[in-house]
């Protein structure tokens, strides 16, 4: 039996990609004439309709949510094969295949359908919420990523204890462990907000519509994924006023700024953990009576604690802590604080390591403050079927 089904072809699946909750979706399977191969169809570019015929076999759609039982839906025979139209009213991640006689039409190479005796691999279908929208300004735009320390420097770099200034702009940053086996990443080349602002005209010439900035919050390292203070910009980058000026000037060029939100972990050298006592606060490492103690999980206090992938300079945050949720997601929290500067949204670091409940609350907070803000989650694997680890 020779059939054709490709979920990326609108002739086979009326809506490619994800489907909005309640929208009508049509599947078509084409029954090709005997001895006519899919390869010939593509090489000859033969009109598909002329190479199909009405099948004798019956076909059934097997469809169900991830981890749940599949439901069966009979397909209707047509002059070209089989068809079915349906609406899915519940959001979620679904998987499906087709049953034709004693064979399963499942996902083959290149995501084409293939007939076999095995039920898997199944095709995937994401059904998203009816009211979900992508802001118009973000559609079809060009997103330009900037690593702030190395993009552009204007003016002198401030002298800050514990940070090594670099004056060889094109040099290789220090990345090897020190004598204690620590990778400090504490050499800085001095890229800053004013430097980015000086390049806005250039970025506009590239048709850039949004800039994604790697972390800008105060931190001990040059990559700044070890947040020290969520409410302050890193002093090497400039001041809050410098950042506000950058946001305002970027908008004049039709460019919006997207900030990197690192909410799965903080730095050990931070207001909140304060492992080295460099901040005036009482950090979680210093006392169980710290207002931040509930933010972290200790196995043996204070030196054994959960950290991001076992890297002890990045103590992992307990997102279930009501205190932490209020600090990040609350009315006077971090998210709304930076949205008030006019940013275009957030890119979430290791989004798949944030609990679903936290992500939902985060989205509500951001969209309540600015419905036009975007939220982008970092996922290293296939993001289309990603479910949070915790």
Predicted features and spans:
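Substrate-binding/active-site clefts of carbohydrate-active enzymes
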Residues: 147-209, 216-341, 362-369, 385-386
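Catalytic metal-binding/acid-base residues of hydrolase active sites
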Residues: 262-264, 349-351, 380
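Conserved, well-ordered alpha-helix/loop/beta-strand core segments that scaffold catalytic motifs
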Residues: 338, 344-347, 351-353
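Acidic-and-aromatic substrate-binding clefts and catalytic sites of carbohydrate-active enzymes
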Residues: 235-237, 351-357, 382-384
């Amino acid at each position: 039996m020779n059939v054709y089904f490709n979920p990326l072809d609108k002739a086979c699946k009326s809506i490619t990609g994800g489907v909005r909750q309640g929208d009508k979706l049509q599947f078509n399977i084409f029954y090709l004439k005997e001895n006519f191969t899919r390869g010939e169809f593509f090489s000859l570019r033969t009109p598909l309709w002329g190479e199909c015929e009405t099948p004798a076999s019956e076909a059934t759609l097997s469809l169900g949510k991830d981890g749940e039982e599949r439901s069966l839906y009979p397909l209707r025979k047509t002059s070209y094969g089989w068809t079915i139209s349906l609406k899915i009213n519940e959001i979620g991640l679904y998987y499906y295949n087709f049953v034709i006689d004693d064979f399963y039409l499942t996902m083959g190479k290149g995501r084409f359908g293939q007939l076999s005796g095995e039920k898997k691999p199944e095709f995937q279908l994401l059904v998203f919420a009816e009211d979900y929208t992508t802001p118009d300004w973000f559609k079809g735009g060009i997103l330009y990523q900037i690593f702030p320390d190395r993009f552009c420097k204007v003016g002198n770099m401030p002298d800050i204890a514990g940070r090594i200034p670099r004056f060889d702009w094109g040099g290789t940053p220090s990345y090897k462990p020190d004598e204690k086996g620590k990778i400090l990443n504490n050499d800085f080349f001095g890229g800053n907000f004013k430097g980015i602002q000086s390049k806005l005209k250039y970025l506009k010439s590239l048709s850039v519509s949004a800039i994604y900035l790697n972390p800008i919050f105060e931190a001990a390292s040059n990559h700044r994924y070890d947040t020290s203070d969520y409410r302050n910009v890193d002093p090497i980058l400039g001041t809050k006023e410098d950042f506000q000026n950058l946001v305002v000037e970027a908008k004049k060029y039709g460019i919006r700024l997207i900030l990197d939100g690192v909410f799965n972990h903080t730095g050990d050298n931070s207001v909140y953990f304060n492992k080295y006592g460099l901040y005036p606060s009482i950090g979680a490492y210093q006392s169980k009576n710290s207002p931040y103690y509930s933010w972290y999980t200790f196995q043996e206090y204070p030196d054994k604690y959960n950290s991001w992938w076992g890297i002890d300079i990045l103590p992992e945050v307990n997102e279930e802590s009501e205190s932490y949720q209020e600090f990040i997601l609350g009315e006077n929290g971090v998210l709304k604080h930076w949205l008030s500067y006019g940013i275009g949204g957030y890119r979430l670091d290791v989004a798949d390591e944030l609990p679903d409940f936290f992500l939902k609350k985060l989205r509500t907070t951001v969209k309540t403050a600015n419905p036009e803000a975007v939220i982008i989650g970092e996922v290293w694997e296939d993001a289309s079927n990603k479910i949070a680890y915790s």
